[in-house]
């Protein structure tokens, strides 16, 4: 079912927007259409999958970074699921050799080769669009300056764009719902199940306490204002897939990286006491991870020069403070369907704003959502006409 949808939908992401009816006809499978585009995903999964753990693993693609139940009527979980399963037309995920730094470096090199001037340590203060283009006010070490352009492509969240335009914020602010951990390990931990080697277990996505019932309990606890007692989380060991992300000395020492992504950690849980809530969420998440290990993960964490554990933890509020992603929402806002929801949007690129000279090129665009690069390409196509 998902492969049918992926094969039909993925190629359209880099084309002008189709209407809902056109995309439905393109998919050509009414059962698949209803399951993902019309019925709450939880209902579909419950009907098709009898095992609680298997159902939960499927649902994580719908709930990661999205604070919702599997049966939410607004279908935000369905939209999140859709973008996770259509990648490459197959749903397969890939990581760049050399890590995201290699991607950034390649983008920089291409931009400079094309004659671009890149400014760092620079804060954009405001945008002033008019019928001839747009002005951009910014500050750097030399004070406040401004430039004009025929088109301005904005990689910030839509809510941040509204602020830069001097417009009133929307009533419904985005809210992120994740806890992100990055750990540097001296080695991978042993599992409770001794028949599975750590290298095999951590080579893909490692799901921890993510059964369907566990996901629902965690949501209910978070919705009631409490950090989940046993947070659902999943891990990715990117250094197993691509050892080049570590330096030669760390590779020789057998070190590994471990990224842990915790679900159902909405920004509201951190508002009253950001530091205390972050510490509590970290402790709860490590306990959750330890529950499937034969040894505490803390014993495998490397230490810095002053003995501090090599653990980076970021709550939604940390993400907002450091990157100005409103509410710490990893998708900049709730994901949108990959089709035009109004007739006048058909044929657009999904990057347009109320100002012709200003386009979105980041995750908050229609068909956005993160590191795909699709919004940037579509914004470029909109400029090229």
Task: Give the ranges of each region predicted by the language model.
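A conserved beta-strand/loop element that lines the FAD pocket in flavoprotein oxidoreductases
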Residues: 110-124
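Mid-domain catalytic core of redox enzymes
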Residues: 96, 122-250
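A glycine-rich dinucleotide-binding beta-alpha-beta segment and adjacent secondary-structure elements
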Residues: 55-71, 228-236, 295-366
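Short coil-to-beta-strand
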Residues: 74-81, 253-262, 354
């Amino acid at each position: 079912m998902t492969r049918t949808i992926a094969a039909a939908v993925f190629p359209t992401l880099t084309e002008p927007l189709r209407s809902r009816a056109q995309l439905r006809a393109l998919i050509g499978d009414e059962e698949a259409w209803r399951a993902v585009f019309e019925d709450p995903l939880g209902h579909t999964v419950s009907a098709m999958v009898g095992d609680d753990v298997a159902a939960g693993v499927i649902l994580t693609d719908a709930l990661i970074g999205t604070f919702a139940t599997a049966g939410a009527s607004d279908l935000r979980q369905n939209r999140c699921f859709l973008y996770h399963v259509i990648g490459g037309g197959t749903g397969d995920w890939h990581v760049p050799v050399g890590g995201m730094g290699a991607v950034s470096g390649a983008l920089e090199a291409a931009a400079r080769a094309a004659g671009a001037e890149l400014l760092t340590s620079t804060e954009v203060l405001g945008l002033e669009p008019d019928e001839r283009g747009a002005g951009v006010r910014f500050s750097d070490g030399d004070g406040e300056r401004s430039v004009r352009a025929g088109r301005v492509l904005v990689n910030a969240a839509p809510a941040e764009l509204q602020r830069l335009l001097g417009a009133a914020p929307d009533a419904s602010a985005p809210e992120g719902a994740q806890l992100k951990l990055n750990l540097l390990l001296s080695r991978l931990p042993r599992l409770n199940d001794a028949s599975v080697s750590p290298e095999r277990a951590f080579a893909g996505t490692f799901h921890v306490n993510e059964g369907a019932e566990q996901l629902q309990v965690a949501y209910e606890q978070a919705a009631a204002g409490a950090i989940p007692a046993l947070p659902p989380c999943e891990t990715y060991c990117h250094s197993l897939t691509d050892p080049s992300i570590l330096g030669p000395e760390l590779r020789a020492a057998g070190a590994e990286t471990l990224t842990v992504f915790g679900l159902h950690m909405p920004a509201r849980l951190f508002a009253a006491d950001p530091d205390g809530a972050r510490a509590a969420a970290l402790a709860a998440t490590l306990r959750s991870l330890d529950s499937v290990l034969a040894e505490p993960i803390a014993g495998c964490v490397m230490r810095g020069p002053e003995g501090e554990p090599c653990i980076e933890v970021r709550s939604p509020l940390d993400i907002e403070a450091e990157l100005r992603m409103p509410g710490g929402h990893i998708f900049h806002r709730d994901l949108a369907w990959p089709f035009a929801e109004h007739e006048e949007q058909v044929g657009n690129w999904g990057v347009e704003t109320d100002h012709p000279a200003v386009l979105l090129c980041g995750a908050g665009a229609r068909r956005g959502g993160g590191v795909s690069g699709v919004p940037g390409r579509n914004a470029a196509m909109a400029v090229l006409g």
